[in-house]
A protein has these predicted regions:
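Charged, compositionally biased interaction regions
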Residues: 1-224
Length: 224
């Protein structure tokens, strides 16, 4: 899988990707066009202590420029294959309602939760906030065995409203090397991983481009 992943990231405009989820299905029933099914398949099998592979300090741009400057950024490969390791949770555990930082939480789909906390200010503050959440979740990891992915967002309700919203928020507002954290994380022989859920900080950052929104006056002027 990693050989193919490197081929993908080294091919033309595919090199602009910053998140690559790659797996294999011996039954040939899995299709990447079935996004929900694809996420389910990978999240049932992935081992975040082993299956994350980062590319940091790259000089390769990404299409959304979520890094801190041009010709700088990072990438990550999620490579999972094998037997099912978990059945994905469909409801939020109670501990999502017992942390003062979390103002709202919701399920996006089985195995993926989103939490809303204060807006992002700077990375030092974000590190302290995420450390608070990591410690909170680490105290009850048995409740999170079937909830492998937690997204941190500015608007949890919007993010969980649809798969489209989840994809847009999570993967355009997250720089892998800066914004991925994990419960019970570790670094061993240059490899980073975590023994609990993966946490992705998908809040808007100060260096992000402003949202492109419709101008209501212009919209009315072109309405038939």
């Amino acid at each position: 899988l990693l050989t193919i992943a490197n081929r993908i990231l080294g091919t033309g405009q595919l090199s602009l990707a910053k998140f690559l989820w790659i797996t294999a299905d011996d039954t040939h029933h899995l299709h990447s066009n079935d996004i929900a099914g694809y996420f389910k398949y990978v999240l049932q099998r992935i081992d975040f202590s082993r299956d994350l592979h980062f590319y940091s300090n790259t000089t390769i741009d990404t299409l959304d420029y979520s890094g801190t400057g041009l010709n700088s950024g990072s990438k990550v490969v999620f490579a999972a294959y094998g037997d099912i390791k978990r059945e994905l949770a469909t409801a939020l555990p109670e501990l999502f309602h017992t942390n003062s930082l979390i103002t709202h939480a919701a399920m996006v789909m089985p195995g993926i939760a989103v939490v809303q906390i204060n807006p992002f200010t700077h990375y030092d503050n974000a590190s302290a906030e995420i450390h608070n959440l990591e410690n909170h979740f680490a105290s009850q990891t048995e409740c999170l065995q079937n909830l492998p992915l937690i997204v941190i967002a500015d608007d949890a309700a919007f993010t969980a409203q649809s798969l489209h919203n989840f994809l847009w928020v999570t993967f355009t507002r997250c720089n892998p090397s800066h914004d991925i954290y994990g419960v019970r994380s570790f670094t061993q022989h240059k490899h980073w991983g975590c023994h609990g859920p993966l946490m992705m900080d998908a809040r808007v950052k100060p260096h992000h481009a402003p949202a492109l929104e419709k101008d209501e006056a212009i919209e009315r002027s072109i309405d038939p």
